[in-house]
Amino acid sequence: MAELRSNMIKQGIDRAPHRSLLRAAGVKDEDFGKPFIAVCNSYIDIVPGHVHLQEFGKIVKEAIREAGGVPFEFNTIGVDDGIAMGHIGMRYSLPSREIIADSVETVVSAHWFDGMVCIPNCDKITPGMMMAAMRVNIPTVFVSGGPMEAGRTSDGRKISLSSVFEGVGAYQSGKINEEELNELEQFGCPTCGSCSGMFTANSMNCLAEALGIALPGNGTILATSPERREFAKKSAKQLMELIKKDIKPRDIVTEKAIDNAFALDMALGGSTNTVLHTLAIANEAGVEYSLERINEVAERVPHLSKLAPASDVYIEDLHEAGGVTAALNELSKKEGALHLDTMTVTAKTLGENIAGHEVKDYNVIYPIDKPFTEKGGLAVLFGNLAPDGAIIKTGGVQDGITRHEGPAIVFESQEEALEGIINRKVEAGHVVIIRYEGPKGGPGMPEMLAPTSQIVGMGLGPKVALITDGRFSGASRGLSIGHVSPEAAEGGPLAFVENGDHVVVDIEQRILSVDVPEEEWEKRKANWKGFEPKVKTGYLARYSKLVTSANTGGIMKI
């Protein structure tokens, strides 16, 4: 074991004041020779995915003590994307990722911890902590709070939060009545945990296994299961082994490991937000990773599992089918799909972790020789509308649609788009453009779950494409193309589209383009008046000035 970092604050005559303060915090004489462990929690009462994490902190701390460490728990913030949806709150969601990363870095660096257990669960908390782990680069293990159970209606149908969002659109279009909508509301989110489909939170917690920074089971063991508590204990004790062997996050999160994470993402049809977050994590790990490489992964990795919101198969079903290890093991049967030699927090390779974990239900995880589709569940599109790329969750597109073209109908904000959709300005065949909603323009790159849910709920899902420099909830589905880069606020092409322009979305060819004569296009660019920031004070104003477009992960640069 390497010399303890924490000796910086606890050894030597000149550290007597430091030790005095540590004694006031409960440190005993016998503790000063032990590793000091940061327990980075994210317990918060208003977020159902985090409401139970106070208990997890206690479990983890006790396990650390039993394994010979001295735990110190601290908390970071969290935003519930579902509750923040559709109003100013959503503009704080992505920016909260940076606050989380900065706050974890600050506490760990200021106090010279020897190792860290991160306890995240929901959308921005997990990647925020991952970014911080790459920065501080001390032995770290991730223990998510676990997924929520799927809801069930009175007739036994499985539902989730996305069912409730889509229910609003169905009610407004007269497809269901208020009583039916109320039933969705009552049963959509039945327990604590991250929302029950392959949405952003569960996508990131599953990817943590493929990256190698969490033990097998992190992504799929239910929040309500006793197994989740045992998992937390096991993870905390494993951290002590990582300290002994001096295995750090940057030893684990390499270019190959990121390939593996995206391979799992492709196989399970994860949220488009995983691209945004994983690029940001790669940046903090010092790994250069391009959008083009993501398409290369998609070309060689098949889509093996179609999960909610694209189907009625939920994370609990994925767990019963063998979980992430089974999905990865099935993928490994195709040559070149995975790098099996990458290191993980088990102190073993990914290949060793997944060996022998066979699929238990091929109706949930398809066989490698009979995949759902031959190509992965995410795609990066390029073209004159997205020179630096745009993302679509192909696994969430209904009816196998691979191409859509039609006239643009342009909205300057999500709120304007929602009003237009509700007032039936959007018709079958349209390409809905929602611009000035990127990281800088939003600001904060708000999610477009409300517009996509309205479109699907009104029966227009397969008939309308939606393109934005904003992003989508993992609960979104349909022809939803987001992360368009450069964003409109930076003078990206999306700023120059006008109503009626002919727009082409071609998933197979990875194309996103608009048919406008060059002379007309240049005229529009010359007449563009630039972007006036929407928020001029507070954190969002600072964020808007420093943040970059989605193709870089939406990171902040000075």
Curated annotation (Swiss-Prot):
Modified residues (N6-carboxylysine): K124
Gene Ontology MF: a single term: dihydroxy-acid dehydratase activity
GO cellular component, one term: cytosol
UniProtKB keywords: 2Fe-2S, Amino-acid biosynthesis, Branched-chain amino acid biosynthesis, Iron, Iron-sulfur, Lyase, Magnesium, Metal-binding
EC number from the UniProt entry: 4.2.1.9
UniProt pathway annotation: Amino-acid biosynthesis; L-isoleucine biosynthesis; L-isoleucine from 2-oxobutanoate: step 3/4; Amino-acid biosynthesis; L-valine biosynthesis; L-valine from pyruvate: step 3/4
Superkingdom of source: Bacteria
Known cofactor(s): [2Fe-2S] cluster; Mg(2+)
GO biological process per UniProt: isoleucine biosynthetic process; L-valine biosynthetic process
Any Pfam family hit: ILVD_EDD_N
Co-factor binding details: Binds 1 [2Fe-2S] cluster per subunit. This cluster acts as a Lewis acid cofactor.
Family as reported in the entry's similarity comment: Belongs to the IlvD/Edd family.
Name by which UniProt lists this protein: Dihydroxy-acid dehydratase
